[in-house]
């Protein structure tokens, strides 16, 4: 562990695992700072399987369940809810009306299914709480002490609540979340727009900011936004996932942010 008595650019680059020019860090939330990616995957699985099962009964088609690993990672991870619903259903050749953001969860529209998933996610959070990765908390403490800007950039509409419940809000200077994306009409990941907005709020150029992501769509956003550094987080430790994160744009891949300290 480094001596933090006099944080400098050299300390930032050598101890925080970042290039010297980086002045701000933009973090995804689920799977990067908090152990909520598995909760999201379970909520997506429950919502989609219920819908697909009922659809199969009605149409006579075979019921093929949602894969909480492969389908989650390929179609919904890191994306706005409506984009995730649209992407996965499209992979099954299913088209639904768009509906509107105020559709209740029992309405079979793109927004309705997305809201049903959000209801399930909130229920799990209420019953089981939220865990913060210890290495992520330590890394946030270190970069805060070093004077780097911190923003959370997430597609989740629950971001503010999660940050407050976990106490991570004390590290975060700015946030761009699912509510921001909807209100400001910002394109979701893999478009870089949400991360570009985060950098703008911290008043730094993209090439002076690092992006921290576990989702393929988020790493793609970091690459296409021309950010100074992209850190891929591979919680599974699987070699193929690490290689995929590198292939699509991660400069470095770690299993835990503490590896950068």
Curated annotation (Swiss-Prot):
Binding site residues for Mg(2+): 28, 30, 214
Disulphide-bonded residues: none
Ranges in a coiled coil: none
NCBIfam families: PGMB-YQAB-SF (TIGR02009)
Post-translational modification: Autophosphorylated.
Function: Catalyzes the interconversion of D-glucose 1-phosphate (G1P) and D-glucose 6-phosphate (G6P), forming beta-D-glucose 1,6-(bis)phosphate (beta-G16P) as an intermediate.
Subunit structure: Monomer.
Keywords attached to this entry: Carbohydrate metabolism, Isomerase, Magnesium, Metal-binding, Phosphoprotein
Source organism of this protein record: Mycobacterium leprae (strain TN)
Residue intervals passing through the bilayer: none
PANTHER family for this protein: 6-PHOSPHOGLUCONATE PHOSPHATASE, HEXITOL PHOSPHATASE B
Cofactor(s) of this protein: Mg(2+)
Keyword ATP-binding: no
MF GO annotations: isomerase activity; metal ion binding
Name of this protein: Beta-phosphoglucomutase
